[in-house]
Amino acid sequence: MKWIKLYEEFESLSQEMIDLTNKLKKYDIPVELWGTGKSKTIKHLLDELNGDECYLEESESKITRYIEFVGVKIYYTDENDVRWALKEDRQEFNDGRTRRRNMPSSVSEKMKFGEDPLVGAIRGIKEELGIDIKGHQLTKRRDLHYNGGSLSYPGLDTKYKGHQYNCQIEREQFDPNGYIEIQKDKKTFFNWVKI
């Protein structure tokens, strides 16, 4: 049985995924840790690359992932003047793993190459929460740049360029029960917190 299972797994690997795995291993990236704990899989990285959400740059000694993203803090003020902030509570993966992140933004979305940050913020809110936001509801906070690792891809150096916004939603956009983003591999849960 093990041999059949092994064959089935390799049969589904594309040449593109094999090439990416070999490229990462060339730089001693511990891809065997990916897809466990809080990390994503090589297939997730391949999907990001093919979706123009990131790119990889090789040098003699290392490989670096570059991403540009928008982060949006979402607020609601109710009829009693109580202010609420939306927070990501958790992600539940189809394989049974749960990941909790202390995200500085309510919604974070990787931008497509050449995408305007405001358009990326509106798209991200629609994709993650199902809310149609108008541009006037968003105010720019700041841009930021930083380097570091990634919980999603352990061992892979990543350089980030971010655009931060605040968003004030209206009563008809507010769901007191929060929101659930459903993707093919996971669900992400968002809850309101009184501030």
Region spans (language model):
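Short linear clamp-binding motif
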Residues: 3-7
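N-terminal leader/linker segments that precede catalytic domains of diphosphate-processing enzymes
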Residues: 8-195
